[in-house]
From Swiss-Prot:
Keywords (A to Z) from UniProt: Hydrolase, Magnesium, Metal-binding, Schiff base
Its job: Involved in phosphonate degradation.
Organism per entry: Salmonella enteritidis PT4 (strain P125109)
Pfam families: Hydrolase
Name of the protein described by the UniProt record: Phosphonoacetaldehyde hydrolase
Amino acid sequence: MMNRIHAVILDWAGTTVDFGSFAPTQIFVEAFRQAFDVEITLAEARVPMGLGKWQHIEALGKLPAVDARWQAKFGRSMSAADIDAIYAAFMPLQIAKVVDFSSPIAGVIDTIAALRAEGIKIGSCSGYPRAVMERLVPAAAEHGYRPDHWVATDDLAAGGRPGPWMALQNVIALGIDAVAHCVKVDDAAPGISEGLNAGMWTVGLAVSGNEFGATWDAYQTMSKEDVAVRREHAASKLYAAGAHYVVDSLADLSGVIAHINARLAQGERP
């Protein structure tokens, strides 16, 4: 039992709940509008996904197109005080909205059950702050998704992604003996970096999450050609971030775990 996976550490939006990661993206658009009457697009809102939300807003302000709009309106770039104001608008909107995006993505419940049947523990972490997670976690539990542990982006003094700290806090809480026996699963590049920085195997999700950027209903009616183009776009970003594997969704994870177990048995490490 030594050379096998003992824990998976899962992201939330776009990985286990909220197909397409729509809860945070729509709220960023609304928060910019509410705080400063500045328009950003959904596509722009998606670019820094995976970071903590204050850092996400900061990164949005540095996007050339957003900075140009800000300069045109205010004659300067976005300041820390501006970020605070947008974050203050973001938080109540996100807390109110997140429960509406708490249903597990197709295949998640069955995959978790299969992993637990193999003795694998289920950790989790998120770019959401604790105030949002305290609404999301019980809502997801009502739908049947209950990880063994969760960490919010503002829980740790060291910080959040792309640093390793949230993933490593899961290792401590779950009592896992080696980071090489852990898999970090995420739909965005900062979460892949988090897993790599923590010394873990990493699996990117190309269809269920932020980079693919479609609702479940839109995905169901999409042409094979459109799916292939979007999948390739998402997979290329996740592989560029260093993902060891990229699959469509969490429903495909069990086969990856078996492959990693075979590599561990041969003495390989992440």
